[in-house]
């Protein structure tokens, strides 16, 4: 099993190209099930979750072709994938595939919309708490679907097709919004989704579906209205830049020090995060094709900042672990409150192994900043926790080995290469 070795103490300097967003790419890929025509997606990242979803879609009969240079001289991904679901081979999504990634459950929406039936295993993925599958099933019931749980599978049927409905999400859910949006595109009549997620990744999906012939209004708001259509067509669209990856590398610079240009990062998707990082002392400059981040070598103090995660545009839960790593070196005490997932502090124990002092009280972590961290062997517990350990290790004295980095490969494209290009002493160790 691979691990990552980091020797801390090196400043970062250079350019880091920001990849296409995994959280945007996955629902766009799943949307290919909605049409018999070809859906072409540009800027698809090379990630384990993407490759797994390709296998899942292929199981349903979706053909695909890859073109474009893998990486240019600057390390920028130019991969384009053409997906064609001319015929749906099966409406069954098996446990052996779905158990590996929760987002694979989202196929239930398009399969039900197009084939009037879906038989999908209950999902897997990172073990970071309850995810709102129930909201999805309740929404599909509102659309007229019959739902049964059988031997660990959800069997959904709508023999006469789905019907538009008014549905209020009990809690904001990005995945639930994705699924019900896709399901509603071909439902008969009008659908209104209230308390919907308005993340940039949701907007990317809405624009894709509209380009395919859907009629969705309310983009960027919490109320979405969908007028059902009979058929969707193919289109070509670009996956947005990964705001979580951009925020992660900005925090790495804040932690290790240095001067880095985050190429292709979209500052409009990071407004709250950038404001928080500026409060910590990071210098940020918005440029036409990205974000320039710098920690002034004459002022190396990291200021403590309290944050609370929340639905967009609040501070994203997917950057909570990375920010906690940064706060371990702050000059003072920071409080981090997690409101999205109830079990997303599994990285605390491992950060403490590096010399951090973090105490938990329910959904709030109190981080007591330390002058120094010490390298140690640590173990990744989930995707975002794994990269928080890398960030901490960049500033720790000595060597850190991060084990179980298969979590990292699910969501970060060539992380060790991107950091090494900027001067970090980091390498992958293959067992």
From Swiss-Prot:
Top EC group: transferase
Annotated residues for binding of phosphoenolpyruvate: 22-23
Catalytic activity: phosphoenolpyruvate + UDP-N-acetyl-alpha-D-glucosamine = UDP-N-acetyl-3-O-(1-carboxyvinyl)-alpha-D-glucosamine + phosphate
Entry protein name: UDP-N-acetylglucosamine 1-carboxyvinyltransferase
Keyword Cell cycle in record: yes
Catalytic residues, chain numbering: 126 (proton donor)
Pathway of action: Cell wall biogenesis; peptidoglycan biosynthesis
Function: Cell wall formation. Adds enolpyruvyl to UDP-N-acetylglucosamine.
Residues with 2-(S-cysteinyl)pyruvic acid O-phosphothioketal modification: 126
GO molecular function per UniProt: UDP-N-acetylglucosamine 1-carboxyvinyltransferase activity
Pfam families membership: EPSP_synthase (PF00275)
GO cellular component, one term: cytoplasm
Positions of UDP-N-acetyl-alpha-D-glucosamine binding: 102, 318, 340
Subcellular location: Cytoplasm
Gene3D superfamilies linked to this entry: Enolpyruvate transferase domain
Protein family per UniProt: Belongs to the EPSP synthase family. MurA subfamily.
Record-listed E.C. numbers: 2.5.1.7
Location, primary (coarse class): cytoplasm
Organism the protein comes from: Bartonella tribocorum (strain CIP 105476 / IBS 506)
Entry keyword set: Cell cycle, Cell division, Cell shape, Cell wall biogenesis/degradation, Cytoplasm, Peptidoglycan synthesis, Pyruvate, Transferase
